[in-house]
């Protein structure tokens, strides 16, 4: 493996969304805080966006739009403590005009390093900066810088904590009120603010040095900015070093954030932060690296990039003290306002198999919001608990009723809140965690109540029809391009993904009852009826309709749209701009019915369909894959990995690999037309790692046993990674036509179709089939 497999390096200046996207990819974090990878010298502009976020810290604002008050709850962009300005002989240096630029994110050491060379009237000036975050003392982070010039001059460095910042990362959100906090206090090395409506106190303490000399505080023209400065005579070719140590805390997780940051600041330093950072990531890569040797130039690097961002989005060291989960963009940008979606389903299984304590921490975020979910259901006239499609601070619904169509710049209705399947995803995550860990305490700590209350919601929605089948109306599936029937409102009926996942949930509820968990009798009785009689629409070829009457929708001339527009991954917006609705057509944003295969596997889904007294042909998976692939535009990054996994099952390894390669580089290549500017796509990052491990390596941990049946692409000569299954660490190595397994404790496994007992610490070899 070479150095390039551990870094992303940018050597040319980019502008606009491409620059924003690079800064998202170069973000640092530790589960508690996220620091966007903008240059230290930059402020919010068309080309740069510094951002600092803390998990769980949200604020609400109100803006009048078309005569209506629109309430938005946003993950707060904190005051910016990483801003510097450099003056030479009294003139501000414009690093945007650098003649040389190099920006690097180092995954192995979790460092962001930037180098700028500027040509000035007197000669050349070079600035090198390195940013780092402390994963152990997770409130701490900092940076160091080096300056050298090939001439003598008066050097002045100013460093700031800028409390004038707004939430401005997402261009289409800028029309809304985006001032999230008010600065309440500034003193030497300390800025304190409070969010405007959620009233969370934010405290930032810092100390800055140049060659060991402390920066004095200076007056600022802006009373929202803490400024410090130091000035020296710089000799020709003299290298000077400066650094800043920063500690942040909020009243969301700390009782007295001001006292905390001041005490912690006196106890830490940039060297201590760097030491903790180095030690932490050394262990992460020892435990969690996925090594792939292949003929694809960027694959290994992309795999590590995805691991890096997932491990920054959450980690037990921080999350055990937080009431937070992982948003769809992690802590790297303000896309989707930092809200938590069903995307947890794409990352929680990864945590469960690699750092199970973190998975448990994230599940508690949902359990802690069960009361809010019950209130959501009550407000909507439903029973039980209804989790929101978009969740933030307290767990009420944060989805908007309107959204902006960026094709025609018109505000359109947003019905995405009807994706009630988010509740099924949460229960699924509980199940995956319990399967991989055997930790049933998550159930007694509120998980069982969550299962029961969401079951109440679903069974209340399930209505018995004249056909003797139970039907669920008024919902949406994962495919967001279908919000209702043509010309109607109110969602769709009998979404296959929803109905089959509910069948699965009712089966688990039954199993829990049989294991002695207390389930209300009436609930269990209705569950027994519904789990055998939910409705599906299956045609004569074995295609499972995405929802009832789906086959009656019109077909789309995709070739015509591609000829007219080129990129059609957001064909929904194109159609609406033309005055037609995707509700009328068989077109999908992403895998919907086929998400069942990603969640449960082919065999399990087959059993569920049979349980509902339907029959499928032997080739049903291929039939459904072909049918829906022809109608899917992959408007979500999470779509392709589903098809990749299915293609592995069908033996189409070349196409599976093509889907994987495209998906795994979603952010690096920014395949969604600039959306990485708003933060990385955490869901697809977790999903692609799962495809590598669960599909190509053939690992299955879902059914209570460690089972593996590898089928590597021909272009891969080696695959190596670890998994944790029920407390046992298993080292997996596939190379030279062999599978080699080493378990930390005795473990009964299934290799292809044979059961094998692994002995603790003994490497066991198997021939690949």
Swiss-Prot record:
Positions of the catalytic residues: 480 (proton donor)
Role this protein plays: Catalyzes the conversion of trehalose 6-phosphate into glucose 1-phosphate and glucose 6-phosphate.
Matches recorded under InterPro entries: 6-hairpin_glycosidase_sf, 6hp_glycosidase-like_sf, Gal_mutarotase_sf_dom, Glyco_hydro_65_C, Glyco_hydro_65_M, Glyco_hydro_65_N, Glyco_hydro_65_N_sf, Malt_Pase/Glycosyl_Hdrlase
A GO molecular-function annotation: trehalose 6-phosphate phosphorylase activity
Protein species of origin: Lactococcus lactis subsp. lactis (strain IL1403) (Streptococcus lactis)
Protein name per the record: Trehalose 6-phosphate phosphorylase
Assembly and oligomerization: Monomer.
One Pfam family hit: Glyco_hydro_65m
Temperature characteristics of this protein: Optimum temperature is 35 degrees Celsius.
pH-linked activity: Optimum pH is 6.3.
Entry keywords, A to Z: Glycosyltransferase, Transferase
Enzyme class: transferase
Gene giving rise to this polypeptide: trePP
